């Protein structure tokens, strides 16, 4: 089964996706309707929640394998829930994909400040990438991923 993932925050940055999963994926611009993206207070990353009439821009990663999805689930943690959504790309009006959504019961935890990709890249990416690489290294060893059996 071919899996697609909609990245809308730090995961829309291919360097972050590659650092977390250890792989690069083909990607294209995409839009998720009826959702809004805002910063989480005290954090440098955003979350999304259902908000009718709003749109979130991001990227659609294609052919994401199950091991990478398992790593992404761990990376996103318990605060985010992986959900199936439909996004639009320039060539396809409806594409099924997974994305990470903050559950409705946590909506009040959002700030009113929108997330800015360029600000994140300029101010935080340099420090965030080593964290992502360390996460990948520790989790792949813990889970036995990518290790040949002898």
Question: Language-model features: where?
Answer:
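Glycine-aromatic micro-motifs
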Residues: 1-150
């Amino acid at each position: 089964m071919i899996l697609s993932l909609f990245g809308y925050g730090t995961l829309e940055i291919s360097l972050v996706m590659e650092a977390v999963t250890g792989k690069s994926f083909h990607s294209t611009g995409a839009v998720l309707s009826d959702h809004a993206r805002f910063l989480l207070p005290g954090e440098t990353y955003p979350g999304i929640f259902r908000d009718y009439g709003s749109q979130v821009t991001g990227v659609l990663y294609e052919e994401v394998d199950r091991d990478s999805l398992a790593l992404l689930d761990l990376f996103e943690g318990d605060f985010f829930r992986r959900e199936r959504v439909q996004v639009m790309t320039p060539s396809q009006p409806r594409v099924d994909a997974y994305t990470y959504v903050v559950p409705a019961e946590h909506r009040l935890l959002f700030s009113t400040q929108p997330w800015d990709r360029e600000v994140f890249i300029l101010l935080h990416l340099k420090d965030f990438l080593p964290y992502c690489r360390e996460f990948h290294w520790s989790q792949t060893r813990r889970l036995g991923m990518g290790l040949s059996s002898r």
